[in-house]
Swiss-Prot record:
Domain KH type-2: 48-119
Pfam hit, one: Ribosomal_S3_C
GO molecular function: rRNA binding; structural constituent of ribosome
Family designation: Belongs to the universal ribosomal protein uS3 family.
Assembly and binders: Part of the 30S ribosomal subunit.
Cell compartments where the protein resides: Plastid, Chloroplast
Organism expressing this protein natively: Psilotum nudum
Signal sequence region: none
Upper classification of the organism: Eukaryota, Viridiplantae, Streptophyta, Embryophyta, Tracheophyta
Gene3D superfamilies noted in UniProt: 3.30.300.20, Ribosomal protein S3, C-terminal domain
SUPFAM superfamilies tied to this protein: Prokaryotic type KH domain (KH-domain type II) (SSF54814), Ribosomal protein S3 C-terminal domain (SSF54821)
Annotated GO CC locations: chloroplast; cytosolic small ribosomal subunit
Biological processes annotated in GO: translation
Protein name: Small ribosomal subunit protein uS3c
UniProt entry keywords in alphabetical sequence: Chloroplast, Plastid, Ribonucleoprotein, Ribosomal protein, RNA-binding, rRNA-binding
Length: 220
């Protein structure tokens, strides 16, 4: 029987990097900083989701990276729809920064919040998984949602590949099943392959559907 491993943890240190860059001098401080990083990410996700104004009702955040130094905390938000925070003179950006400063609550460390715009947000598995989840929650047929997601992601046949898997009570049927589709190559067993992965649960009236997205980017 095959044993499954997380695609990102499997490649950590080779093609994947950590999302938090810092070290702690003791276990007590380490646990405090890990919890603080989690709270910062939750704060950003909830704020963007609350103030989103695009038709898909999500901000397109691909990842959040946190860098810590003795006197500085740098938070980088990689997202596709930066207009959500930068419009109207950046009022929402300053509000978000103020909310994060309340979580950090340190007089000795300065907070630096940076927005990085992604040119092609739908080539990020997190953005694509959230898009599919919102379609399923709005009772769109899962095959139609997956087909549209593949169109948004673009053509991977000549350069990499994409795999999408949905598990649960698809279209409301009583018996749960797993459906998946793939375009191009997705070499999960190759450690040096640059594969991005994300899992996102869709909360429908029939129960939770698990959405998994793998995207292989062949830069050779």
């Amino acid at each position: 029987m095959g044993q499954k491993i997380h695609p990102l943890g499997f490649r950590l240190g080779t093609t994947q990097n950590h999302c938090s860059y810092w070290f702690a001098q003791s276990k007590k401080i380490y646990s405090k900083l890990v919890k603080e990083d989690k709270e910062i990410r939750n704060c950003i996700e909830k704020y963007v989701q609350k103030h989103t104004n695009n038709p898909f009702h999500y901000g397109g955040i691909a990842r959040i990276e946190i860098y810590r130094k003795t006197d500085l905390i740098r938070v980088e938000i990689h997202m596709g729809f930066t207009d959500l925070l930068t419009e109207n003179g950046g009022i929402r950006f300053e509000q978000l920064k103020s909310n994060i400063e309340k979580i950090v609550n340190s007089k000795n460390q300065k907070l630096c919040l940076i927005l990085i715009k992604i040119d092609k947000p739908y080539t990020e598995p997190k953005v694509l998984a959230e898009y599919i989840a919102l379609q399923l929650e709005n009772r769109v047929v899962f095959r139609k949602a997956v087909k549209k997601a593949l169109e948004l992601a673009g053509n991977f046949k000549n350069k990499g590949g994409i795999k999408i898997q949905i598990a649960g009570r698809l279209n409301g049927i009583e018996i749960a099943r797993v459906e998946w589709t793939r375009e191009g190559r997705v070499p999960l067993q190759t450690i040096r392959a640059h594969i991005n992965y994300y899992y996102y649960p869709a909360k429908t009236i029939y129960g939770i559907l698990g959405i998994k997205v793998w995207i292989y980017q062949n830069d050779e």
